[in-house]
Amino acid sequence: GELTKMENIGYYNGKFDLIEKMTVPMNDRAMYFGDGVYDATYSVNRTIFALEDHLDRFYNSCRLLEIPAPMPREELKKTLYECVNKVDDPNQFVYWEATRGTGIRNHVFPDTPSNLLIYTRPCPMKDLSLRYKLATMEDKRFYYCNVKTLNLIPSVLASQRALEKGCDETVFHRGDLVTECAHSNVSIIKDGKFITHQLDCLVLPGITRKHLIE
């Protein structure tokens, strides 16, 4: 018969288990340096949304930070779907990251293979009719915002400030220029025009942004 589905799934370098039971080595460079990249999307009825676009961005992030891809693209697609299909709920949040290997703390690149971490968990679809309350904050992030790195401290702090103000999201700005939000791009439709920040080192090349433009 069919294998029993799981409540959620974690994956690390070939091992699968419940997220709560998974462990990661202390010497994984994500621990010391946040030395890795990630991407994330949703599975709806076990179909991963815009997967090719997310994989394009993931492999580009690896390239920009000189992190060897943890596995070939087609193999990663297969592994992501393997994770999605192990979970009972067909609607899931799907997250994966590559880190620059494992080794004693040293800033220079280690001579070890990169690591791959994946997890998927149930995620109900959001009510798109809800209105969002926004806070604003000066954008003090560094000039690697086009890379989806594990270094998210500014977004963590911005999200906490938004919560404290009873808001849903924080809009970053550099002076008079709006860049993006703590965990989303900003797109405005005004007077029939679609307005969003140009793609450069100050914003992430968002997949939803790309699909809105297309």
Q: Residue ranges of each PLM-predicted region?
A:
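Helix-start/capping segments and mature chain N-termini
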Residues: L3-N85, I104-E214
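Ordered, amphipathic secondary-structure segments that act as subunit-interaction surfaces
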Residues: L80, N85-A98
